[in-house]
Amino acid sequence: IADLKNRIETIQKFKSGNNSSSLINIISRYTKLANKGNLGKNIYACKDKINIKLFEKKSEIDVFRFLQSLENLVNTNNWEYSQLINSFEENIQVLIEIFDNENGVMVMTEDLNLRKNRLNLLAIVRNYSLLIADFTLLNF
C-alpha cells in the first residue's frame, strides 16, 4: 500500500507541474507506437533488444542513452518514483526529437529490421513509464 501511495503522490505532484501535458502527450505517442510492436511490457534492459548498429540518427542514440540512465537508476537500491519522473521531465526534448522532421526517424519504416529496432526502443521507454503509470490514461 505504501508503494501505491507513493506512486499516487508522485503522479499528483507531476500533474501540477508545467511540463505535465507535454510529457503525457509524448509518452502516450511512444506507447501507442510501441504497442504496434511485440516487445513485452516487462522488458527494461536494452541488451539483446536494441541493435545500436542500426541507428541512423543522433536522436536514436540519445533515446538509447536515456534508457541506459533509466536502467542505471532502477537498478540502484531505493530508487524513487519521483527520480524516475524527473528523469523523464529532464529528457523531454530527447523524447520529442526522435519524431522531428529533420533530426528524427520514421519509426514505421519499410525496413523491418529498422522498424523492429525502433519499436523496441520506444517500447522500453513505454515500459519504464509504466512503472509510474499508464500515461495514456492520465487526464489533465
Give the label of every model feature segment.
Residues 1-140:
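Amphipathic alpha-helical "coupling" segments that flank catalytic cores
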